[in-house]
């Protein structure tokens, strides 16, 4: 057995070219689709971060009896069962909720794991003193603002680092058998923070304050802001 599980957080199939989207540029997803079986009637049970992961590990619906949380001591975890059966399991992710209180105990089910830092409000880089947030619509986070200074530009994004580590794993273990590689980038989860080179592929008429982190609420922002925020999401997909 040699298997790769590729999981993107907050990925909407309606925004992918293989599923008929006309406003995004997703060439890598198109290449993947050419070598894949595409499902058009496959539905998730739980959609939030950790409930969805618990369903993935256990094969049971999470939303019926609990909310956002860790793997429970009584849960049977798929990667752990594989590990006990002699299949080497490895997780590569920048999904920072894996290593925070309340969301932990998933990554420890694998033989080994690599955590890429810097996404969302990950308490990664230290900054002693006040952090000034720029004018913005929607949400903003001071720790995220600190982190952004270290992940700007090509080659520095956590998403790129995750796939770099995946290539490293495959190169190191290309001749091995009996392994599961779980690759899980947090993108395109908000905030929609992509390099300028990709943002520039999506032009709009928005000239307001920063808007790349929409609130979990009814949409009340001006149409131009909505289009701009959607374009930031598209830049991450590209």
Where in the sequence are the language-model features?
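Catalytic domains that recognize anionic headgroups
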Residues: 1-238
């Amino acid at each position: 057995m040699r298997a790769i599980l590729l999981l993107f957080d907050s990925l909407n199939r309606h925004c992918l070219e293989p599923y008929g989207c006309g406003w995004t540029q997703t060439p890598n997803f198109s290449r993947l689709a050419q070598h894949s079986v595409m499902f058009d009637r496959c539905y998730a049970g739980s959609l939030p971060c950790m409930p969805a992961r618990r369903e993935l590990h256990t094969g049971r619906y999470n939303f019926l009896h609990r909310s956002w949380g860790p793997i429970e001591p009584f849960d049977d975890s798929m990667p752990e069962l594989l590990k006990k059966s002699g299949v080497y399991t490895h997780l590569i992710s920048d999904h920072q909720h894996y290593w925070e209180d309340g969301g932990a105990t998933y990554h420890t089910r694998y033989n080994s794991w690599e955590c890429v830092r810097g996404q969302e409000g990950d308490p990664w880089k230290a900054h002693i003193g006040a952090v000034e947030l720029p004018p913005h619509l929607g949400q903003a986070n001071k720790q995220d603002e600190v982190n952004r200074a270290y992940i700007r530009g090509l080659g520095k994004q956590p998403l790129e680092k995750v796939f770099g580590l995946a290539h490293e794993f495959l190169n190191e273990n290309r001749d091995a058998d009996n392994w599961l590689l779980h690759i899980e980038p947090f993108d395109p989860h908000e905030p929609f923070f992509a390099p300028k080179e990709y943002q520039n592929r999506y032009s709009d008429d928005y000239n307001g304050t920063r808007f790349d982190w929409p609130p979990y609420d009814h949409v009340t922002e001006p149409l131009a802001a909505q289009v701009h925020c959607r374009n930031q999401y598209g830049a991450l997909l590209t």
